């Protein structure tokens, strides 16, 4: 057919004929060989570098961990001289206690960060929110609604006072208004049954220690208006607090009288409030010291109401006090009838004996002034700015803070404390990595196993008691993260808060509603079985717990984060962080309190006499050790080695178990890669991370407060005391014998 129509055009290029090829010169050959050699070397180096492992972890998580550890520590301090300064010196230089805080530390920073998460989830309205969550958000909005709160002044409180027989000092003609109807039984019971406020006599419904599936009525000494009985000495370091306390009473009484348009007699206010202080001082002196209340066996005194009437008769306002009427006044609010045969556990027989001569000295007016005040003082910070400010000097004397906590923080905490499951749901949905649960379960299994293996090393405990200790350890139930129900069972969560209905412009009434709801719920338990599966903590909490009555350990979602735990951080840090916390909580089942309860949570002596005696002897070592620490921030006072014993036993046991579990991990999985920028191996990093959990400091006022009220040793002594007893620590840091961190005498219980 001839040429194709789509034929391509070809351009013909005439190329010249090549010249004759030239030979390479020696220089060119040499250079070519050199280039070839350099290329081979470069390729080899690249290949080697790509596969070379210098043993240092360079992941972003490792870099973050290393940066945190380096920032917090002071490497110029000798670790064997003062490990607190070595581990926390950098933290102390970089951090100042906020004006709103009584203390500040890594624990508090985690709590601050958790509060930010709570604020975000509580202030965000969502159309798909279930009713329980809607209620939590409404409660939060009512709490931050400062304009509504301020506009009401003290009116919500004034409306409430007649319900509790008024406050005599702020009432005209109190005797005429209330005197005829006032009885001690009714007045004390009203505060208790409606609002959960226990003054003079602390009656409550709780688990029966000796039969932990049942509830029983307990009678105990009351809490005080000041942090501890020591404050009522009102001299030296306690003088300012006593003065501020009485001034606080007078200020609030004055504000109420002003609002009620009543005449103000300053002398009369001072006279009556000083009388309240005098009465409370006597009550405080009648209470037992904490160190005398450490043995649950001695604390437990079960008797009938008839026996209480016989053993602890009281006379108030010239009339005999009826224990039966008093108890029925409280329990009738939840439709429970009590007879003289009702069993009651008395925790404070000595207090009730000492109470009798005190109460005969004071009039109904004096007693009601104290009782109403103790209720009012709790509510002042829920009123307008003027009322809040009346508390400033008192707050400063007790906590050293010069500013109030930010409203949103206080409100986030308040809602979390009252609706822990609704808030817990919001928190875990926003911030909790679910895979953490399985990793922590595995850690618990490892540390429980180490605890049981360690029993074999104990020479002070006989075989019979060891066997029972093992049974108890195996029976410990664990709770990790959060109860599944709070996320998966909408109906159950809604039903939990069914009776609660909040108004956004009535914060005070919402608080009262919560008090009534919570107290009613607790009183109703008297005729119910104990729910042993119930969680003893909400999810949005940076803490961990052990319940002796349930033999249960709890690790809420809030604590499962760095520095305690991360599935991505080095295992040495996890074992030194959450591993130590797990060991600590397990050991609580065997401390000076927990050891008295059996595997089912009942108060039963399961120890042979010899083992019990040896336990006390071993413990005494720690009582002396921690009791010899003096705290400069608390005016040089010594720690109370008896009151902090349980926590110190748990710290020491927990650290030892976690370290042994980490050694087992290394044997099984091999050494981990080192962290960048730190000239420390992983054994050393284990102890460093443990210590940095406790970096922090206190205001002097709060140090004075906590040394009397906190069952934990201050953070610096938790580090020093525990590590002084650890031979493994001294080995890891090569501490010479008898250096400060490596004393020859070491204490060990578990």
From Swiss-Prot:
Gene Ontology BP annotations: amyloid-beta clearance; amyloid-beta clearance by cellular catabolic process; amyloid-beta metabolic process; angiotensin maturation; bradykinin catabolic process; cellular response to cytokine stimulus; cellular response to UV-A; cellular response to UV-B
Keyword annotations of the record: Cell membrane, Charcot-Marie-Tooth disease, Disease variant, Disulfide bond, Glycoprotein, Hydrolase, Lipoprotein, Membrane, Metal-binding, Metalloprotease, Myristate, Neurodegeneration, Neuropathy, Phosphoprotein, Protease, Signal-anchor, Spinocerebellar ataxia, Transmembrane, Transmembrane helix, Zinc
Reactions that this protein is recorded to catalyse: Preferential cleavage of polypeptides between hydrophobic residues, particularly with Phe or Tyr at P1'; substance P + H2O = substance P(1-9) + L-Leu-L-Met-NH2; substance P + H2O = substance P(1-7) + L-Phe-Gly-L-Leu-L-Met-NH2; neurotensin + H2O = neurotensin(1-11) + L-isoleucyl-L-leucine
Top-level enzyme category: hydrolase
E.C. number: 3.4.24.11
Keyword Transport in record: no
Stop-transfer sequence, short sequence motif: residues: 16-23
Main location: membrane
Catalytic residues, chain numbering: 585, 651
Transmembrane segment boundaries: 29-51
Extracellular-side positions: 52-750
UniProt-annotated binding residues for Zn(2+): 584, 588, 647
Classification via InterPro entries: MetalloPept_cat_dom_sf (IPR024079), Peptidase_M13 (IPR000718), Peptidase_M13_C (IPR018497), Peptidase_M13_dom_2 (IPR042089), Peptidase_M13_N (IPR008753)
Keyword Transmembrane helix tagged: yes
Cofactor notes: Binds 1 zinc ion per subunit.
Molecular function terms, GO-annotated: cardiolipin binding; endopeptidase activity; exopeptidase activity; metallocarboxypeptidase activity; metalloendopeptidase activity; oligopeptidase activity; peptide binding; phosphatidylserine binding
Region described as Disordered: spans on this chain: 1-20
Known glycosylation sites: 145, 285, 325, 628
Record Gene3D superfamilies: Collagenase (Catalytic Domain) (3.40.390.10), Neutral endopeptidase , domain2 (1.10.1380.10)
Cellular localization per UniProt: Cell membrane
Associated disease: Charcot-Marie-Tooth disease, axonal, type 2T: An axonal form of Charcot-Marie-Tooth disease, a disorder of the peripheral nervous system, characterized by progressive weakness and atrophy, initially of the peroneal muscles and later of the distal muscles of the arms. Charcot-Marie-Tooth disease is classified in two main groups on the basis of electrophysiologic properties and histopathology: primary peripheral demyelinating neuropathies (designated CMT1 when they are dominantly inherited) and primary peripheral axonal neuropathies (CMT2).
Free-text function comment from the UniProt entry: Thermolysin-like specificity, but is almost confined on acting on polypeptides of up to 30 amino acids. Biologically important in the destruction of opioid peptides such as Met- and Leu-enkephalins by cleavage of a Gly-Phe bond. Catalyzes cleavage of bradykinin, substance P and neurotensin peptides. Able to cleave angiotensin-1, angiotensin-2 and angiotensin 1-9. Involved in the degradation of atrial natriuretic factor (ANF) and brain natriuretic factor (BNP(1-32)). Displays UV-inducible elastase activity toward skin preelastic and elastic fibers.
Name of this protein: Neprilysin
Native source species: Homo sapiens (Human)
């Amino acid at each position: 057919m001839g040429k194709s129509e789509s034929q391509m055009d070809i351009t013909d290029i005439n190329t010249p004929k090549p010249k004759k090829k030239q030979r390479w010169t020696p220089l060119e050959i040499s250079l070519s060989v050199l280039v070839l050699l350099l290329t081979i070397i470069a390729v080899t180096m690249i290949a080697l570098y790509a596969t070379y492992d210098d043993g240092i972890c360079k992941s972003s998580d490792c870099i973050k961990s290393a940066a945190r550890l380096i920032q917090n520590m002071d490497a110029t301090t000798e670790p064997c001289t003062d490990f607190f300064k070595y581990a926390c010196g950098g933290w102390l230089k970089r951090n100042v206690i906020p004006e709103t805080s009584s203390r500040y530390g890594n624990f508090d920073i985690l709590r601050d960060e958790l509060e930010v998460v709570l604020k975000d989830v509580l202030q965000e309205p969502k159309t798909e929110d279930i009713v329980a969550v809607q209620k939590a958000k409404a409660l939060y909005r009512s709490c931050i609604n400062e304009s509504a709160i301020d506009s009401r002044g003290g009116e919500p409180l004034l409306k409430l006072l007649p319900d509790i027989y008024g406050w005599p000092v702020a009432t005209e003609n109190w005797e005429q208004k209330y005197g005829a109807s006032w009885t001690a039984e009714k007045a004390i019971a009203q505060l208790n049954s409606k609002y959960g406020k226990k003054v003079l006599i602390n009656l409550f419904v709780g688990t029966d220690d000796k039969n932990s599936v049942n509830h029983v009525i307990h009678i105990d000494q009351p809490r005080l208006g000041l942090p501890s009985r020591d404050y009522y000495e009102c001299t030296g370091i306690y003088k300012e607090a006593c003065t501020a306390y009485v001034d606080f009473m007078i200020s609030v009484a004055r504000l109420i009288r002003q609002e009620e348009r009543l005449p103000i007699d300053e002398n009369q206010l001072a006279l009556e409030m000083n009388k309240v202080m005098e009465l409370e001082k006597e009550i405080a002196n009648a209470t037992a010291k904490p160190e005398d209340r450490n043995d649950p066996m001695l604390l437990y005194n079960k008797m009938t109401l008839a026996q209480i009437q016989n053993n602890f008769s009281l006379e108030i306002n010239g009339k005999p006090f009826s224990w039966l009427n008093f108890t029925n006044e409280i329990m009738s609010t939840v439709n429970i009838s009590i007879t003289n045969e009702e069993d009651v556990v008395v925790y404070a027989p000595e207090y009730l004996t000492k109470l009798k001569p005190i109460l005969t000295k004071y009039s109904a007016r004096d007693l009601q002034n104290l009782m109403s005040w103790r209720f009012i003082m709790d509510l002042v910070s829920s009123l307008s700015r003027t009322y809040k400010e009346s508390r400033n000097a008192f707050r400063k004397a007790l906590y050293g803070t010069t500013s109030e906590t930010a409203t949103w923080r206080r409100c986030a905490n308040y809602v979390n404390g009252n609706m822990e499951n609704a808030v817990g749901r919001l928190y875990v949905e926003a911030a909790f990595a679910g895979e953490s649960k399985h990793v922590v379960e595995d850690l618990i299994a490892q540390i429980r196993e180490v605890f049981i293996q360690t029993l074999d090393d104990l020479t002070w405990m006989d075989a019979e008691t060891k066997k029972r200790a093992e049974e108890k350890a195996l029976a410990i139930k664990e709770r990790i993260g959060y109860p599944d129900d709070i996320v998966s069972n909408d109906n159950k969560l809604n039903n939990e808060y069914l009776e609660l209905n909040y108004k956004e412009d009535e914060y005070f009434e919402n608080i009262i509603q919560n008090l009534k709801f919570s107290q009613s719920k607790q009183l109703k338990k008297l005729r119910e079985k104990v729910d042993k599966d119930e969680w003893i903590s909400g999810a949005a909490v940076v803490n961990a717990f052990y319940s002796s009555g349930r033999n249960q350990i709890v690790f809420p979602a809030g604590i499962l984060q760095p520095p305690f735990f991360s599935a991505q951080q080095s295992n040495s840090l996890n074992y030194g962080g959450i591993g130590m916390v797990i060991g600590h909580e397990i050991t609580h089942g065997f401390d000076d309190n927990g050891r008295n309860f059996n595997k089912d949570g009942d108060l039963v002596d399961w120890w042979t006499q010899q083992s019990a005696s040896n336990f006390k002897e071993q413990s005494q070592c720690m009582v002396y050790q921690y009791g010899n620490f003096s705290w400069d921030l608390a005016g040089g006072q010594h720690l109370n080695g008896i009151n902090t014993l349980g926590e110190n036993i748990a710290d020491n046991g927990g650290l030892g178990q976690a370290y042994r579990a980490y050694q087992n991990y290394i044997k099984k999985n091999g050494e981990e890669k080192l962290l960048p920028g730190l000239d420390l191996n992983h054994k050393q990093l284990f102890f460093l991370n443990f210590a940095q959990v406790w970096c922090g400091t206190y205001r002097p006022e709060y140090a004075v407060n906590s040394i009397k009220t906190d069952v934990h040793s201050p953070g610096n002594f938790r580090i020093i005391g525990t590590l002084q007893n650890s031979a493994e620590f001294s080995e890891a840091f090569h501490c010479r014998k008898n250096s400060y961190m490596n004393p020859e005498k070491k204490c060990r219980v578990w």
